[in-house]
């Protein structure tokens, strides 16, 4: 698993000596929010209004963080409103690839070969790991978020007026308990 350094792909791997061989997940690099009216969310900038068909989700079926966004997409009836591309589950030297076979859909938006190219499209000088899930804004051609816990919170209520689905998986009275299961 490589990374982007100043917008250039590098095949450098995790330095596991610094972490005693443990995987340490980096903080997400894109933390904007989709809101019902397009106002800024808890982090990031404004301009991401909930609109049917405007957003795209990049996932891997091999990633549990991406998997939970797919579960929420289905539970909140967003399948017809947020399109999806599935990367190949095997991550090699170029990171997540957009192979097209029984395990992956390919990049249905831009026909990219690798997910890092989506990060470069969003931020040409990006530095950091290229991770899934990625919530993409097709209108502004940029990453809204790559933080799964925030993506599922957006999916929980932001599109309710569009879908009519008012199921609430993040009720105010239970949020502290929910954090035990949704925090990374």
Over which residues does each language-model region extend?
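N-terminal regions that are enriched for targeting/export leaders
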Residues: 1-49, 53
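Short, polar/flexible loop-turn hinges at active-site or ligand-entry regions and domain interfaces
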Residues: 142-143, 161-169
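Charged, often glycine-rich, active-site loop that binds/positions anionic groups
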Residues: 90-108
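A generic secondary-structure signal for well-formed alpha-helical elements
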Residues: 70, 76-78, 122-123, 139, ...
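Conserved small/polar residues in nucleotide/adenosyl-binding loops
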Residues: 181-184
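Local sequence-structure signature of Cys/Sec-based thiol-disulfide redox active-site neighborhoods
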Residues: 47-90
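Structural micro-motif
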Residues: 112-134
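Non-catalytic, surface beta->alpha helical segment in thiol-disulfide oxidoreductase systems
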Residues: 141-154
């Amino acid at each position: 698993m490589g990374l982007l350094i100043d917008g250039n792909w590098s095949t450098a791997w995790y330095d596991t000596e610094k972490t005693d061989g443990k995987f340490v997940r980096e903080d997400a690099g894109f933390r904007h929010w989709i809101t019902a009216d397009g106002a800024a969310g808890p982090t990031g900038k404004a301009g991401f209004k909930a609109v049917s068909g405007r957003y795209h989700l990049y996932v891997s079926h091999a990633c549990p963080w991406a998997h939970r966004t797919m579960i929420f997409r289905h539970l909140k009836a967003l399948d017809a409103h947020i399109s999806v591309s599935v990367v190949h589950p095997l991550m090699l030297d170029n990171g997540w690839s957009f192979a097209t076979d029984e395990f992956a859909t390919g990049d249905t938006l831009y026909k990219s070969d690798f997910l890092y190219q989506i990060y470069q499209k969003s931020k040409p000088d990006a530095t950091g790991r290229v991770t899934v899930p990625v919530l993409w804004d097709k209108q502004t051609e940029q990453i809204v978020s790559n933080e799964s816990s925030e993506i599922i919170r957006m999916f929980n209520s932001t599109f309710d007026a569009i879908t009519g689905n008012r199921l609430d998986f993040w009720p105010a009275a239970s949020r502290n308990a929910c954090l035990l299961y949704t925090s990374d």
